[in-house]
A protein has these predicted regions:
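Active-site/ligand-binding-proximal alpha/beta "capping" segment
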Residues: 148-154, 158-161
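Flexible, glycine/charged-enriched surface loops at secondary-structure junctions
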Residues: 165-171
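Conserved small/polar residues in nucleotide/adenosyl-binding loops
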Residues: 174-176
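Residues in well-ordered beta-strands of folded domains
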Residues: 111, 142, 171
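Thiamine diphosphate
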Residues: 1-133, 138, 146, 155
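Arginine/glycine-rich "motif VI" loop of SF2 helicases in the C-terminal RecA-like domain
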Residues: 103, 162-164
Length: 176
């Protein structure tokens, strides 16, 4: 049996690892608690880390979450395997582009650290308010309950979107 490599990581690092391996482009705009995913991917790209396709991931940091979703849509239209990372209000700003992406059957994965929607004051507690607002967009959803599930189901999301051409929201509350 081959030697297994065990690492200790949080859900953000697990999702970022899989996203990096399965993506050619990552459109990012950091928003807590999903910021570490984008930071990991940006760092690995700068270090020249190779993905499953033998290339480094092209990282585009955008001016807003809406811009990141627009960049994802454009990149997908050009034929690149693309992903993004977001949470909370950031995900809500991506909804208009999500309808376009799903309607055009463009395969992609949005990795979401599910978080409470803030109303009058900042709230960083985890819940599913943000992703439930996206139910009607046409994106399939996978939800994880542990870091191991994040690692496993992130790969499932990337493979399933390629096979089905249905975009996925890969969500978890495991960001701490």
């Amino acid at each position: 049996m081959a030697n297994k490599k065990f690492i200790t990581c949080d859900g953000n690092q697990a999702a970022a690892h899989i996203a990096y391996m399965f993506s050619e482009v990552a459109a990012i705009y950091p928003i807590t608690p999903s910021s570490p995913m984008a930071e990991h991917v940006d760092e690995w790209s700068a270090q020249g880390r190779i993905n499953l396709f033998g290339d480094t991931v092209k990282v585009q940091e955008m001016q807003s979450e809406g811009g990141a979703a627009g960049a994802v849509h454009g990149s997908l239209q050009a034929g690149a395997l693309t992903t993004t990372f977001t949470a909370s209000q950031g995900l809500l700003l991506m909804i208009p582009n999500m309808y376009k992406i799903a309607g055009e059957l463009l395969p992609c994965v949005f990795h979401v650290s599910a978080r409470t929607l803030a109303s009058h004051s900042l709230c960083i507690f985890g819940d599913h308010q943000d992703v439930m607002a996206c139910r009607q967009t046409g994106f399939a959803m996978l939800c994880e309950g542990s870091v191991q599930e994040v690692m496993d189901l992130s790969a499932v999301a990337h493979l399933a979107t390629l096979e089905s051409r249905v975009p996925f929201i890969n969500l978890s509350l495991i960001h701490i």
